[in-house]
């Protein structure tokens, strides 16, 4: 079962205009898209996803005249809006970042460290290298960097060395449980979390270019959204959330850091591009009981001035 995290909170905070144009940057299985469509009359929704399974699901289950699904990363939203004369005309954007439940639950996709499957991890299986190929191609230094920066893994170098040594002896790491067991054997079980959690996250982020795609979307988001339009971002780990928070904060108070250092007067209000609608919201107890994966979700919502 796929549950859209923080569904009501995010849709309510978008303050849907029934005649508006909206973008679901991460369609998944359409939970947020369906909720938006239910509030539209003459408005329309454009959804994006890199995953071909999500595209197929949308085409089979979302046959609405005011809905369009685009097989592309959300990093291409600006280009899409430019090509379709939609810059500055979008009433709202929702982004539900990270991996979806169907991707995690399908062992064949290679995202899970508890179900065995090919070590793939690509959200778009039509292109790019698999996680298995990445482990073979990356150096110890690069692999250690990825685990440390993208996974915040304390034992990054130790794990990277063990992986490269294993590959040298065995040729490759082909399955998810093969990698998960190798990580567990390297560092042991030192906490409640599965010891493979951070490295799997890091490898997935690298394979799918997730953080760079997020930065590309946020870099041009002001040109896409109209005045009074809102942006809702749901993140699941500190790296994503930090990027979202810093970008939003920079557009809400562009000279905040400079003011703190130089004691300058507050900036001209014309430099402020956004305002907070929801600075930080987390799942309530009912949602946590229904969906354990919602425990790390953070919702931030802003409005363009």
UniProtKB/Swiss-Prot annotation:
An individual GO BP term: rRNA base methylation
EC number: 2.1.1.199
A GO molecular-function descriptor: rRNA (cytosine-N4-)-methyltransferase activity
Residues that, per the record, bind S-adenosyl-L-methionine: 30-32, 49, 74, 96, 103
Top-level EC class as recorded in UniProt: transferase
One Gene Ontology cellular component: cytoplasm
Catalytic activity: cytidine(1402) in 16S rRNA + S-adenosyl-L-methionine = N(4)-methylcytidine(1402) in 16S rRNA + S-adenosyl-L-homocysteine + H(+)
Alphabetic keyword roster: Cytoplasm, Methyltransferase, rRNA processing, S-adenosyl-L-methionine, Transferase
Localization: Cytoplasm
One protein family per Pfam: Methyltransf_5
Gene3D superfamilies (UniProt xref): Putative methyltransferase TM0872, insert domain (1.10.150.170), Vaccinia Virus protein VP39 (3.40.50.150)
Family of the protein in this entry: Belongs to the methyltransferase superfamily. RsmH family.
Protein's job: Specifically methylates the N4 position of cytidine in position 1402 (C1402) of 16S rRNA.
Identification of the protein by name: Ribosomal RNA small subunit methyltransferase H
């Amino acid at each position: 079962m796929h549950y859209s995290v923080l569904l009501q909170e995010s849709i309510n905070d978008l303050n849907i205009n029934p005649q508006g144009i909206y973008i679901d940057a991460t369609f998944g299985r359409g939970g947020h898209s369906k909720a938006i469509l239910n509030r539209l009359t003459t408005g329309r929704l454009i959804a994006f996803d890199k995953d071909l399974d999500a595209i197929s699901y949308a085409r089979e289950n979302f046959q609405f005249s005011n809905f369009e699904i685009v097989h592309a990363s959300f990093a291409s939203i600006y280009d899409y809006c430019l090509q379709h004369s939609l810059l500055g005309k979008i009433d709202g954007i929702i982004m539900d970042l990270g991996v979806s439940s169907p991707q995690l639950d399908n062992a064949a996709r290679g995202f899970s460290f508890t179900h065995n499957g090919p070590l793939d991890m690509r959200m778009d299986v039509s292109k790019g290298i698999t996680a298995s190929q990445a482990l073979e191609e990356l150096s110890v230094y690069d692999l250690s960097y990825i685990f440390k920066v993208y996974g915040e893994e304390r034992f990054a170098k130790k794990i990277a060395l063990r992986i490269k040594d294993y590959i040298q002896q065995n040729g490759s790491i082909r399955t998810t449980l093969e990698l998960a067991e190798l990580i567990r054997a390297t560092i042991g079980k030192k906490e409640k979390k599965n010891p493979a959690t951070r490295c799997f996250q890091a490898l997935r982020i690298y394979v799918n270019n997730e953080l760079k795609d997020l930065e590309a979307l946020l870099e041009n988001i002001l040109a896409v959204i109209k005045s009074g339009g809102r942006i809702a971002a749901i993140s699941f780990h500190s790296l994503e959330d930090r990027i979202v928070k810093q970008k939003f904060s920079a557009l809400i108070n562009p000279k905040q850091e400079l003011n703190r250092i130089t004691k300058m007067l507050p900036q001209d209000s014309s430099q402020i591009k956004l305002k907070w609608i929801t600075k930080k919201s987390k799942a309530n107890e009912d949602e946590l009981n229904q969906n354990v994966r919602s425990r790390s979700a953070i919702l931030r919502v802003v409005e363009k001035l």
